[in-house]
Amino acid sequence: MITPKVLSGFKDRLPKDAIQKAQLLAKVSVVFQSFGFVPIETPHLEYAEALLPDASSDIQKEIYRFKDHGDRDVALRFDLTVPLARFVSLHHQILGMPFKRYAIGNVFRGERAQKGRYREFTQCDFDFIGSESLVCDAEIIQVIIASLKALDLEDFCVSINHRKILNGICEYFGVSQVNEALRIVDKLEKIGLDGVGEELKKECDLNSNTIKELLEMVQIKQNDLSHAEFFEKIAYLKDYNENLKKGIQDLERLYQLLGDLQISQNLYKIDFSIARGLGYYTGIVYETTLNDMKSLGSVCSGGRYDHLTKNFSKENLQGVGASIGIDRLIVALSEMQLLDERSTQAKVLIACMHEEYFSYANRLAESLRQSGIFSEVYPEAQKIKKPFSYANHKGHEFVAVIGEEEFKSETLSLKNMHSGMQLNCLSFLKALEIIGENDEDL
């Protein structure tokens, strides 16, 4: 006999968990659609050559790669952005540019399993393809903020940086292995200053003084300074080189656009340590953390990539986008008690006291559904205790009881499972009025 078990880093979703996830995805999808983003789908499995060029060395170690039955070198996607590059290159003439898309799907990384981190997890990506305008970058940040607010989150911060600033810092300190250095800097939160310093010394052959000064610069943060105060503080960096000058100018323009959108300044700050480990980022980058749960890591991250299709097409298409980590958000929202704890989406359970009442019960359930009330019929004629126990376990708000009197008079008795109050022999319209008082729970 096979012992039922799940691989480490993977998980089953019980009904309650699956409902919570579906509700979150529905909410963020509405936000995406409200900004004009349209859905697409790409396969879980791609040719390995399509995925590997843009993966950092760390992520390449985590990719699930194998030979399929046709002896082809294939891999499970590790994010939704690289498949997007292949998708856009294949279909760009049909899509038209600029193109705004969102995609929701599972991705796979063989990283160490821990709280809020899985080897299979769901990403919600939204991207603006085919425009180099910073208006697009500002809109992506606007969508991040709107999405988190749609999930009833208010206390978070989008930490923003620019890859040109990081490139400029590396240039200033004479770092030749820029991508490798930035990959290491991106691990600052995970391994700390000492760990980053050791790796920079080992992998990039930097001396201790250079490492010390470089790390001091990448730790520059806006913190509680106003936008104007911060840009005044870092203005001297524009004189160091063109990369730093261009990066800071782009951030100044971005902040002007975000200000025009009247987004609260508490929700976004500049942080020079934000690097994003994926090698395809070229411009503004960002990571979003919940202020009271920073140990969970970024719940939404992304940035600009100006060479999206370079591996697939001579026609260069740039883009900017972000990815919401739904699984991490579920962990956070659960701890904050902001999730629906029911194991059913049906608001009403209809219970029959006798077999012959099922035809009436089914008609009643269908009438409720047509009125927008999710309903189900308990499948067995039982003493009332068993359906009530079932409703308590699943989380139905109401139980409609059909006994002899209700059957004959074509009424129903209705019990509120939260308050315990029961009203007998109600007309359908009266019951509908009572049930519909809390439609936001549907």
UniProtKB/Swiss-Prot annotation:
Domain of life: Bacteria
Primary site of residence: cytoplasm
Species of provenance: Helicobacter pylori (strain G27)
Subunit comment: Homodimer.
CDD domains per record: HisRS-like_core, HisRS_anticodon
Annotated protein name in UniProt: Histidine--tRNA ligase
Keyword terms: Aminoacyl-tRNA synthetase, ATP-binding, Cytoplasm, Ligase, Nucleotide-binding, Protein biosynthesis
Gene3D superfamilies from the UniProt entry: Anticodon-binding domain, Bira Bifunctional Protein, Domain 2
Family affiliation: Belongs to the class-II aminoacyl-tRNA synthetase family.
Reaction equations catalysed: tRNA(His) + L-histidine + ATP = L-histidyl-tRNA(His) + AMP + diphosphate + H(+)
GO cellular component: cytoplasm
UniProt KW Ribonucleoprotein keyword: no
GO molecular function per UniProt: ATP binding; histidine-tRNA ligase activity
Gene Ontology biological-process entries: histidyl-tRNA aminoacylation
